[in-house]
Curated annotation (Swiss-Prot):
Name this protein carries in UniProt: Toxin subunit YenC2
Annotated RHS repeat ranges: 168-182, 297-311, 329-343, 361-375, 408-422, 500-514, 580-594, 606-620, 640-654
Activity regulation: Toxin complex is secreted when grown at 25 degrees Celsius or less; at higher temperatures the proteins are present intracellularly but not secreted.
Subunit structure: Semipurified toxin complex consists of at least YenA1-YenA2-YenB-YenC1-YenC2-Chi1-Chi2. YenB and the N-terminus of YenC2 form a large hollow shell of beta-strands. The shell is closed at both ends, within which the C-terminus of YenC2 is probably found. The C-terminal region dissociates from the YenB-YenC2 complex at pH 4.5 but not 7.5. The Yen-TC:K9 subcomplex is about 26 nm tall and 22 nm in diameter with 5-fold symmetry and 5 copies of YenA1, YenA2, Chi1 and Chi2; the chitinase subunits may be solvent accessible on the exterior the complex.
Length: 970
């Protein structure tokens, strides 16, 4: 790596006199032209109230085209958005902050006015007072069509039977776009124990749409098919799920160690014997996986870099004594640059081969520009590989053993100043597999298509819907979208007078796919493949004509360590050459791509290697029939017959390195709504199509914090961000209860003599004087589990920064503070105010880090918990990043309520998954107990530095939280 490439390329932010960010400047250099530096400036404009009004990216600002324009209400809530990528949207809220009307798919006419001809309007209905204001229904209307009620919520009453099932007040019937979700019972901790799904009749017909008119549930139920798919779970006393029985009766069981981490898992097929999936899992003191052994006897070990704790090795092998013989199956070794970009990946389990005067090493190497965008990649591919497109290459069968099947390749990537991937140049000289893939990008947006569709940038926007969804995949392949922006149908082959080849999809109320139907004409008959997605189960059938040719149940193991484990159980139509109830362990790489498949005997089924942005470079298997049943590939996502990958909220085109539609979460990853993982697919991955995640838990960008707004706007009933808005309301009510208890206690203390008052107040948790110490109340939601985990009641822990009883390890720095500036003390802040670095209350130095950390541990212990190693590590990192000098206003780093909430998520044994997964599914809320009480309390400078990973801070951070720099020498 050339260090000079990155020299003098800082990220610069320019603020106006109000402290608002008006310019973001980045400097781009390419390693092939290190002396050429391109200045990339993103512009922001704010209105007179300080609310964002416009944003322009480095490319479109030269054309005087605004990427985003916003119109806000008096409180700063965005009510109207103009986007060159995603079209225009209108959102109106009620006085409670709930969405009432949302209008999408608004295009801009040639006259500059909004074109509502294809607009979609959604209206939301809620309970009236004195009921708690829960959602009742959602109405959807496409302009010119009749309105349909697409969602309906039915809540349990208060009968003895409902109480016995813990259903009182719960949403027990949710009618959505796919049918009905019925909750039959709930645990004491609030986790659903029995959930049933019923589908609409004739759901395979994409013209059949849900419409839950009226209030007659019997009329609604008449629209449903008779089949019921019920999932049953069992939990322990703390609410952790122990067993899950899927819709056909297969049972998954898990066990946890004393720290609450997964230690083993088992599967019992319906009518069968229990079998081991994960035999044992061991972890480091920091909670990182060290070793896992599967039920097939295959062992995976993990190696981490001591200084950074980055994952540098994943070794999968059959150990000595294995029935199939000892063998290293995969041995991935990672090398990084200082900031965590992957420089090389080597598979030491593979041999170096020689063919046509070239040395073919099982290694991939990568180079980046100064913005950490991938600009070149080299590796090996199958010698017969052709130009990458939407089709998979033919697999090598059987698994190769000679040197004539692999050759070296190099790929280079070219981007414009807005981050659009413009060109992929592929070179494999030994096989003359040289080609260039060009992407044509609009001159007035970031919309882009393969040049095979058009080479004229002026024609690109016409190939997209008003809301930014691509209308054509390849020449002759039309894309049809639902009013909600979900891909409904892909026309693969249009035949005119005879039936077409197509693939269609149906979604639930959270826009998650529940059904896929593929139709193909063969020999004058139609072959229809159907995949129904249920919790822990994929039900796949194939019919030829009127007869059912195959009935396959794919059991998806929810807890299987790093591997994805799938069991293939045929009810009928099992093909020859594959056993029934075959268990397939799929071992992933750093970005979750499925590289190695192994069966229950520890024998290799298939191996696959990928180009950086997707696409298959190497694919080999022991038999052709087994390759047909590999559906999960790049990034651990399902690949459809279209060649697209389904991520959850969007579809991805691996041959173009672009998303098929604009980001539904908005600008969470910048102004370009089609860019894939910031053009760094080796370091970043996208779990659901909304925002990239750094699985190395490296620094996050400020842009990622905009996801808070998107999460609230989505207001999911189900899905990865489910229940966040409702939890915010719950958190607000909990804070209100603390304040009310304080008032009640003060009323009791009123009139009592001072001596008696002090004695009486000792037994009270909340009084006015104690609230000044607590200052803040925090809560946290985690949605990683099938049943979300919520906890509040976190309060600031005491830690003195006074001259008396100074916190251990702290040395006070006596700055002179003007009396008038005391208004900025947290206890006296009113509405959320901007952090003013030059107006702080002084600084303190952590002179003895170990004494400081010991003091924090002691405070956590006194509150009834232990400081987790991950949180302690973040506190230490925060100290190091600030040269051990911190602002007094921010208090003792690590003692605030929101950091305790973070500590709870990491430590809670009821939450499964690794640290990255736990944090990604966590939402932290903090509210004031002093000053402007019961209002959002932005995370202070210290908390923002500590809560700096994948977790979502839903109540904001102080402005400039990462830019406070002390320029004075102490």
């Amino acid at each position: 790596m050339d260090i000079q490439l990155f020299s003098k390329t800082p990220s610069v932010t320019v603020f106006d006199n109000r402290g608002l960010s008006v310019r973001d400047i980045a400097y781009r250099r390419h390693p092939d032209t290190p002396k050429v530096t391109e200045e990339c400036i993103t512009y922001h404009q704010f209105d007179f109230r300080g609310f964002l009004a416009q944003s322009l990216d480095p490319r479109l600002n030269h054309k005087e085209v605004t990427n985003f324009s916003y119109l806000t209400d008096l409180n700063g809530n965005i009510i109207y958005t103009q986007s060159v990528d995603a079209g225009n949207t209108l959102v109106l809220n009620d006085t409670e902050g709930r969405s009432v009307i949302a209008m999408t798919n608004i295009s801009r006419g040639e006259n500059g006015k909004d074109d509502l001809s294809l607009a979609v309007t959604r209206t939301f209905q809620y309970e009236n007072a004195p009921l708690p204001g829960r959602p009742l229904s959602v109405t959807e209307q496409v302009n010119g069509e009749n309105a349909r009620i697409t969602e309906h919520f039915v809540y349990a009453g208060n009968t003895p039977q409902e109480k016995n099932l813990n259903l009182a007040g719960q949403c027990v019937s949710y009618y959505d776009a796919a049918g009905l979700i019925q909750t039959d019972s709930v645990s004491l901790t609030g986790k659903p124990l029995s959930v049933s799904r019923k589908l609409l009749k004739n759901l395979d017909d994409t013209n059949i749409l849900a419409d839950w008119q009226g209030n007659d549930t019997s009329a609604w139920n008449s629209l449903l098919a008779t089949e019921i798919y019920t999932t049953v779970t069992r939990t322990d006393a703390a609410g952790a799920v122990l067993t899950t029985i899927d819709a056909v009766g297969n049972q998954q069981r898990v066990a946890f160690d004393i720290a609450g981490q997964l230690s083993a898992s088992w599967l019992t097929l319906k009518g069968g014997q229990e079998q081991v999936i994960i035999k044992v899992l061991t972890y480091s003191a920091a909670g990182q996986k060290l070793r896992e052994e599967g039920g097939n006897g295959v062992v995976t070990t993990y190696t981490y870099e001591a200084e950074t704790q980055r994952l540098i090795g994943i070794k999968t092998e059959r150990p000595n004594g294995h029935a199939a013989g000892a063998k290293v199956l995969q041995d991935l070794r990672y090398e990084y640059d200082p900031v965590g970009n992957v420089l090389s990946i080597t598979n030491d389990a593979e041999e170096t081969r020689f063919w046509r005067n070239q040395k073919v090493v099982p290694e991939n190497a990568y180079r980046y520009d100064s913005l950490y965008q991938l600009v070149s990649a080299s590796g090996r591919e199958v010698a017969g590989a052709g130009q990458q497109g939407s089709d998979l290459p033919s697999p090598l069968v059987p698994l190769p053993s000679d040197s004539s099947v692999y050759t070296n390749y190099t790929r280079t990537y070219t981007y414009d100043s807005a981050g659009n991937l413009m060109r992929i140049r592929h070179s494999a000289p030994a096989t003359n597999n040289n080609y260039t893939l060009n992407i044509t990008v609009s001159e007035r947006s970031n919309r882009g298509v393969m040049s095979s569709l058009t080479e004229n940038p002026a024609d690109v926007d016409a190939l997209f819907t008003a809301s930014g969804s691509q209308k054509c995949l390849q020449q002759g392949q039309s894309l049809i979208w639902t009013p909600r922006g979900e891909l409904r149908t892909v026309l693969l082959v249009a035949r005119g007078e005879t039936a077409d080849d197509s693939e269609s999809y149906r979604y639930d109320g959270s826009s998650q796919r529940i059904l896929k139907i593929s139709s193909q004409q063969t020999n004058h008959s139609a072959r229809v493949q159907r995949a129904l997605y249920l919790p822990g189960l994929e039900w796949r059938t194939m019919t030829g004509g009127v007869a059912e040719a195959e009935n396959l149940q794919v059991i998806c193991i929810g807890e299987a360590g790093r591997a994805q484990v799938r069991v293939l159980h045929w009810e009928s139509g099992k093909p020859d050459g594959i056993i029934n109830d075959q268990i397939r362990w799929s071992y992933d790489n750093l970005t979750c791509s499925s590289g190695l498949e192994v069966d229950g005997d520890g024998l290799v089924i298939s191996m696959e290697e990928y180009y950086p942005y997707g696409g298959t470079a190497v694919w080999a298997a022991r038999s052709h029939i087994e390759t047909a049943y590999k559906t999960v590939r790049y990034s651990g996502k399902e690949r459809d017959a279209t060649g697209l990958y389904y991520y959850g909220f969007r579809y991805y085109q691996p041959w173009a390195g672009r998303w098929l539609s604009a980001d539904p979460a908005g600008t969470v990853d910048g102004l370009n709504l089609y860019r894939m993982v910031r053009n760094n697919p080796l370091r970043l991955t996208d779990p659901d199509g909304m925002a990239p995640l750094d699985w190395l838990d490296l620094d996050t960008t400020n842009a990622s914090r905009d996801i808070v707004k998107a999460i609230y706007q989505l207001n999911q009933i189900d899905g990865p961000h489910r229940g966040v808005r409702d939890t915010y309301q719950r958190m607000t009510e909990s804070t209100g209860m603390i304040l009310q208890e304080t008032l009640n206690n003060e009323a009791v203390l009123k009139g009592i003599k001072q001596k008696d008052k002090e004695k009486k107040s000792r037994g009270m948790k909340f009084t006015n004087s104690k609230l000044k110490t607590y200052a803040a109340h925090a809560g946290v939601l985690n949605t990683l589990q099938p049943d979300p985990v919520y906890k509040d009641g976190f309060l600031n822990l005491p830690g003195s920064l006074g001259n008396k009883n100074t916190f251990p390890g702290v040395e006070l720095i006596e700055d002179k503070v003007k009396p008038s500036l005391s208004q900025y003390h947290p206890d006296k802040l009113g509405k959320s105010q901007r952090w003013k670095p030059e107006s702080s209350l002084g600084y303190y130095r952590v002179a003895d880090t170990e004494a400081f950390i010991t003091g924090i541990r002691s405070q956590y212990k006194s509150s009834g918990t232990d400081l987790h190693a991950v949180v302690e590590g973040r506190i230490r990192d925060h100290l190091l990043a600030n040269n051990n000098v911190l602002p007094k206003m921010a208090g003792i780093a690590g003692l605030h309520a929101e950091v305790q909430a973070l500590n709870y998520i990491i430590s809670n044994p009821d939450i499964e998954g690794g640290n990255a997964e736990r944090l990604n599914g966590s939402y932290i809320f903090t509210q004031r107990l002093v000053g402007d009480v019961n209002q959002d309390f932005p995370a202070c400078y210290n908390c923002s530095g500590i809560i700096s990973g994948l977790e979502n801070v839903m109540t904001g951070r102080v402005n400039n939280d990462v830019r406070l720099k002390r320029r004075k020498s102490f």
